[in-house]
C-alpha cells in the first residue's frame, strides 16, 4: 500500500461522466469508484484507458498520477481500441482536419451514449500533438523535465541511453570479483565495450523516432509495440504506446522494460567472468557479450505486464564465448629439382 494517495481519473464503461479518485491501493480506488458510479464492487475491476491493461496491486504503484482508468463490472471488457484508431490515423503526416470536422458534426448529431463516448475519444486522440517535436510546439509534454531537453526525440534518446548506461555500470562493478590475474583482461574487455557504446551513442536511437529505420524500435511517428515476453515471439495483448503523444504516455512509457532474453545478472555477466578466468590463452569474444548486454540482439521492449520476472533458464552459446583460434598453415617443404 502506498504512503501517499495516488490520484487518477476514473470513468465507467457506459457513463459519459469522469471523476477524480484518490487511493493508496488498487482496491481502495476500485471501492471508491464503485460507490461513485453506484456499481457492485464484487466482480468489478480497473484497467488502463490507454490500452486496456488490467490493474493489479503490484502494477498500481507504477501507474502515473492522473492516469485515466476504466471501471469494468462483471462481464464487461475494454480493449483500448482507441489506441488502434490513433495508430492508424498517425500514419498520415498531415493533420486530419476533415476527419476532425466530420467527427465533430457526428458528435453533435449522435444521441446514443456509447457512440458519443467513442466519437469524443476519437476527437481527443486525433487532436493530440503527436507530430509536434519541440518544447515550443508542445509545452505540456515537457512539464516536469529539465530545461535542457528541447525536443521529444532528444529526451527519449536520453532515456534509452540512461537504461543502457545502467547496464554498463552493472558490468563495471565486477572487475574485483575476477581476481588480480584476470582483472587486466576484464578491464580490456570492458574498455572495448565502452568504446563501442560511445561510438553508438549508447544505442539511444532505439527510442528516437527520427533515427534510421533499422536503428529504432518505433515507427517514424513514435509508436512502440510490445515485443512480448522473453519466451514468446510476440505480444498476445498487442500492447502499444506513443510516448511522443502526451505527457501521460511519456511517463507511462518509463514503466516499459528493455528485458534481456538471456538474463544479464543471472547468466551473461557470470558467464563473462568465468570465461575471463578460464580463458587459458584463448581470446574472449567481447563483441558477442556486447550484443547480449546492450543491443536488440538480446533485448526486447516489453509492457510491464509482459515482463516475466521468473528465471529464464537460457544460456550463452558456448561456441561464441571465445573467438575462433586461427591455425597457422605449415609450409610445405620445397622439392628439389632432379
Swiss-Prot record:
GO biological processes: apoptotic chromosome condensation; apoptotic DNA fragmentation; DNA catabolic process; negative regulation of apoptotic DNA fragmentation
E.C. code: 3.-.-.-
TM segment ranges: none
Self-association and partners: Heterodimer of DFFA and DFFB. Interacts with H1-1.
Purpose of the protein: Nuclease that induces DNA fragmentation and chromatin condensation during apoptosis. Degrades naked DNA and induces apoptotic morphology.
GO molecular function: disordered domain specific binding; DNA binding; DNA endonuclease activity; DNA nuclease activity; enzyme binding; identical protein binding; protein domain specific binding
Keyword Nucleus: yes
Enzyme class, first EC level, given as a word: hydrolase
InterPro entries (alphabetical): CIDE-N_dom (IPR003508), DFF40 (IPR039729), DFF40_C (IPR015311), His-Me_finger_sf (IPR044925)
Keyword Nucleus recorded: yes
Protein's organism: Homo sapiens (Human)
Activation and inhibition: Inhibited by DFFA (DFF45).
GO cellular component, one term: nucleolus
Name of the protein in question: DNA fragmentation factor subunit beta
Classification via Pfam families: CIDE-N, DFF40
Keyword field: Apoptosis, Cytoplasm, Hydrolase, Nuclease, Nucleus
Location of the protein in the cell: Cytoplasm; Nucleus
CDD domains: CIDE_N_CAD
CIDE-N domain: residues covered: 4-80
SUPFAM superfamilies (alphabetical): CAD & PB1 domains, His-Me finger endonucleases
